[in-house]
Regions:
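A cross-family phosphate/adenosyl-ligand binding-site feature
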Residues: 1-56, 61-124
Length: 124
C-alpha cells in the first residue's frame, strides 16, 4: 500500500527501491510500481545506506520484528541508516506506541505521503 500511494502521489518523480524481507513482499511492491526491488538480509543491509527515506512499519527497526522476519542485522542497518525514517505505528509485536491514537492503515499512509510531499515540496 505504501508503494502504491507514493507512486500515485509522486508519479515518476519518486525513485522507489522496494526492499522486502521475503519474495512475496518484494513482488507486491514491484507490482505497485517500485522502480527496482531486492529481497533478504543482504539486500536490506546493503541498500539501507543508499536511500533517502525508509518507510514501513515500526517493526522494521526491531530485531526479530515481523514474527522474526527482521533479523538483528536488518534492524541495525535500518535504524542506523542516515536516511529519514517515516515509520507506521503498526503494533504487531508486543509493543505499544504510547501517545499515538489508533488510525486505520490507509489514514497512516495518507499522513506518510503528506509528510513526504511537504519535505520534497510537492503540490497535490
Amino acid at each position: 500500500l505504501i508503494v502504491k500511494s507514493l507512486r500515485e502521489s509522486f508519479g515518476e518523480f519518486a525513485d522507489i527501491t522496494a526492499l522486502g524481507t521475503n519474495s512475496a513482499a518484494t513482488a507486491a511492491m514491484m507490482k505497485a510500481k517500485a522502480n527496482r526491488g531486492a529481497t533478504g538480509e543482504n539486500a536490506i543491509v546493503w541498500n539501507s545506506g543508499r536511500v533517502d527515506v525508509i518507510t514501513g512499519p515500526v517493526s522494521v527497526v526491531l530485531a526479530n520484528g515481523m514474527l522474526g522476519e527482521v533479523t538483528p542485522k536488518m534492524a541495525e542497518a535500518l535504524s542506523s541508516s542516515r536516511a529519514e525514517k517515516l515509520l507506521l505505528p503498526l503494533n504487531q509485536e508486543l509493543l505499544t506506541m504510547v501517545g499515538l491514537k489508533k488510525e486505520p492503515l490507509p489514514h497512516l499512509i495518507d499522513e506518510l505521503v503528506n509528510l513526504m510531499k511537504e519535505k520534497y515540496h510537492v503540490r497535490s
